[in-house]
Amino acid sequence: MHCPFCAAVDTKVIDSRLVSDGSQVRRRRQCLDCNERFTTFEVAELVLPRVIKSDEVREPFNEEKLRRGMLKALEKRPVSSDDVETAISHIKSQLRATGEREVPTKMVGNLVMEALKRLDKVAYIRFASVYRSFEDVREFGEEIARLQD
Protein backbone atom coordinates (compact mmCIF):
# COMPACT_ATOMS: atom_id res chain seq x y z
CA MET A 1 0.00 0.00 0.00
CA HIS A 2 1.34 3.45 -0.91
CA CYS A 3 1.98 5.89 1.90
CA PRO A 4 -0.62 8.71 1.80
CA PHE A 5 2.01 11.16 3.11
CA CYS A 6 5.02 10.59 0.84
CA ALA A 7 3.68 8.08 -1.74
CA ALA A 8 6.38 5.55 -0.88
CA VAL A 9 5.60 1.99 -1.89
CA ASP A 10 6.99 0.27 1.21
CA THR A 11 4.79 0.24 4.30
CA LYS A 12 4.46 -2.32 7.04
CA VAL A 13 1.48 -3.45 9.08
CA ILE A 14 2.06 -2.81 12.79
CA ASP A 15 -1.39 -3.85 14.10
CA SER A 16 -4.48 -5.66 12.75
CA ARG A 17 -7.88 -6.01 14.41
CA LEU A 18 -11.34 -7.15 13.45
CA VAL A 19 -13.95 -4.40 13.60
CA SER A 20 -17.70 -4.16 13.23
CA ASP A 21 -19.29 -7.57 12.96
CA GLY A 22 -16.02 -9.17 11.91
CA SER A 23 -16.50 -8.24 8.27
CA GLN A 24 -13.73 -5.59 8.34
CA VAL A 25 -10.08 -5.59 9.33
CA ARG A 26 -8.54 -2.39 10.70
CA ARG A 27 -4.82 -2.15 10.05
CA ARG A 28 -2.32 0.35 11.46
CA ARG A 29 0.50 0.83 9.00
CA GLN A 30 3.81 2.64 9.10
CA CYS A 31 5.71 4.02 6.13
CA LEU A 32 9.25 2.67 5.94
CA ASP A 33 10.49 5.89 4.31
CA CYS A 34 8.92 8.76 6.28
CA ASN A 35 7.83 6.73 9.38
CA GLU A 36 4.32 8.28 9.35
CA ARG A 37 1.53 6.04 10.59
CA PHE A 38 -1.93 5.66 9.06
CA THR A 39 -4.99 3.43 9.32
CA THR A 40 -6.59 1.35 6.59
CA PHE A 41 -9.77 -0.70 6.58
CA GLU A 42 -10.03 -3.89 4.58
CA VAL A 43 -13.30 -5.51 3.51
CA ALA A 44 -13.97 -8.43 1.22
CA GLU A 45 -15.35 -7.40 -2.13
CA LEU A 46 -18.51 -9.44 -2.42
CA VAL A 47 -20.47 -9.25 -5.62
CA LEU A 48 -24.23 -8.95 -5.33
CA PRO A 49 -26.44 -10.66 -7.90
CA ARG A 50 -27.93 -8.67 -10.77
CA VAL A 51 -31.63 -7.85 -10.48
CA ILE A 52 -34.17 -9.05 -13.05
CA LYS A 53 -36.95 -6.48 -13.31
CA SER A 54 -40.55 -7.38 -14.18
CA ASP A 55 -39.96 -6.41 -17.83
CA GLU A 56 -36.99 -8.86 -17.92
CA VAL A 57 -34.44 -6.02 -18.00
CA ARG A 58 -31.37 -6.88 -15.95
CA GLU A 59 -29.51 -4.28 -13.95
CA PRO A 60 -26.89 -4.24 -11.20
CA PHE A 61 -28.15 -4.33 -7.62
CA ASN A 62 -28.52 -0.73 -6.45
CA GLU A 63 -28.05 -0.35 -2.70
CA GLU A 64 -28.98 3.33 -2.84
CA LYS A 65 -32.32 2.49 -4.46
CA LEU A 66 -32.97 -0.06 -1.70
CA ARG A 67 -32.08 2.52 0.97
CA ARG A 68 -34.33 5.20 -0.58
CA GLY A 69 -37.29 2.82 -0.74
CA MET A 70 -36.88 1.76 2.87
CA LEU A 71 -36.35 5.33 4.11
CA LYS A 72 -39.45 6.49 2.23
CA ALA A 73 -41.54 3.82 3.99
CA LEU A 74 -39.90 4.67 7.34
CA GLU A 75 -40.35 8.44 6.97
CA LYS A 76 -41.33 10.02 10.32
CA ARG A 77 -41.23 6.62 12.05
CA PRO A 78 -39.20 5.95 15.23
CA VAL A 79 -36.51 3.76 13.62
CA SER A 80 -32.82 4.61 13.93
CA SER A 81 -30.55 4.91 10.92
CA ASP A 82 -28.36 2.20 12.47
CA ASP A 83 -31.33 -0.19 12.42
CA VAL A 84 -31.98 0.67 8.77
CA GLU A 85 -28.32 0.07 7.86
CA THR A 86 -28.36 -3.25 9.73
CA ALA A 87 -31.49 -4.29 7.82
CA ILE A 88 -29.87 -3.31 4.50
CA SER A 89 -26.75 -5.34 5.37
CA HIS A 90 -28.95 -8.30 6.26
CA ILE A 91 -30.85 -8.05 2.95
CA LYS A 92 -27.55 -7.90 1.03
CA SER A 93 -26.26 -10.94 2.95
CA GLN A 94 -29.43 -12.87 2.11
CA LEU A 95 -29.06 -11.98 -1.57
CA ARG A 96 -25.41 -13.10 -1.59
CA ALA A 97 -26.36 -16.32 0.23
CA THR A 98 -28.63 -17.35 -2.66
CA GLY A 99 -25.50 -18.05 -4.68
CA GLU A 100 -27.38 -16.86 -7.75
CA ARG A 101 -25.92 -14.52 -10.35
CA GLU A 102 -29.36 -12.96 -10.91
CA VAL A 103 -32.43 -12.60 -8.70
CA PRO A 104 -35.92 -11.30 -9.51
CA THR A 105 -36.99 -7.94 -8.09
CA LYS A 106 -39.83 -9.82 -6.41
CA MET A 107 -37.29 -11.56 -4.17
CA VAL A 108 -35.69 -8.24 -3.23
CA GLY A 109 -39.13 -6.72 -2.52
CA ASN A 110 -40.08 -9.65 -0.30
CA LEU A 111 -36.82 -9.34 1.66
CA VAL A 112 -37.50 -5.62 2.14
CA MET A 113 -41.03 -6.33 3.37
CA GLU A 114 -39.72 -8.92 5.86
CA ALA A 115 -37.16 -6.41 7.15
CA LEU A 116 -39.73 -3.62 7.44
CA LYS A 117 -42.17 -5.93 9.21
CA ARG A 118 -39.51 -6.47 11.90
CA LEU A 119 -38.55 -2.78 12.08
CA ASP A 120 -41.93 -1.04 12.00
CA LYS A 121 -45.39 -2.35 11.11
CA VAL A 122 -46.62 1.02 9.79
CA ALA A 123 -43.63 1.26 7.44
CA TYR A 124 -44.32 -2.31 6.34
CA ILE A 125 -47.93 -1.41 5.42
CA ARG A 126 -46.73 1.72 3.58
CA PHE A 127 -44.24 -0.28 1.54
CA ALA A 128 -46.61 -3.19 0.91
CA SER A 129 -49.37 -0.85 -0.28
CA VAL A 130 -47.12 0.47 -3.05
CA TYR A 131 -45.22 -2.75 -3.75
CA ARG A 132 -48.36 -4.86 -4.00
CA SER A 133 -50.40 -2.06 -5.61
CA PHE A 134 -53.31 -2.07 -3.16
CA GLU A 135 -56.46 -1.00 -5.01
CA ASP A 136 -58.77 -0.15 -2.11
CA VAL A 137 -59.17 0.09 1.65
CA ARG A 138 -60.25 -3.57 1.86
CA GLU A 139 -56.77 -4.69 0.76
CA PHE A 140 -55.18 -2.49 3.44
CA GLY A 141 -57.50 -4.06 6.01
CA GLU A 142 -56.65 -7.59 4.90
CA GLU A 143 -52.92 -6.89 5.17
CA ILE A 144 -53.34 -5.31 8.61
CA ALA A 145 -55.38 -8.33 9.72
CA ARG A 146 -52.55 -10.64 8.56
CA LEU A 147 -50.09 -8.57 10.62
CA GLN A 148 -52.21 -9.00 13.73
CA ASP A 149 -52.32 -12.81 13.42
Curated annotation (Swiss-Prot):
The keyword Metal-binding applies. It holds the Pfam family ATP-cone. Signal peptide: none annotated. GO terms for molecular function: ATP binding; double-stranded DNA binding; zinc ion binding. Residues 49-139 form the ATP-cone domain. Its cofactor is Zn(2+). It comes from the Bacteria. The keyword Acetylation does not apply. Binds 1 zinc ion. InterPro entries: ATP-cone_dom (IPR005144), NrdR-like_N (IPR055173), RNR_NrdR-like (IPR003796). Keywords: ATP-binding, DNA-binding, Metal-binding, Nucleotide-binding, Repressor, Transcription, Transcription regulation, Zinc, Zinc-finger. GO terms for biological process: negative regulation of DNA-templated transcription. A zinc finger (unnamed) spans 3-34. Belongs to the NrdR family. Negatively regulates transcription of bacterial ribonucleotide reductase nrd genes and operons by binding to NrdR-boxes. This is Transcriptional repressor NrdR. The lineage of its organism: Bacteria, Pseudomonadati, Pseudomonadota, Gammaproteobacteria, Enterobacterales. The gene is nrdR.
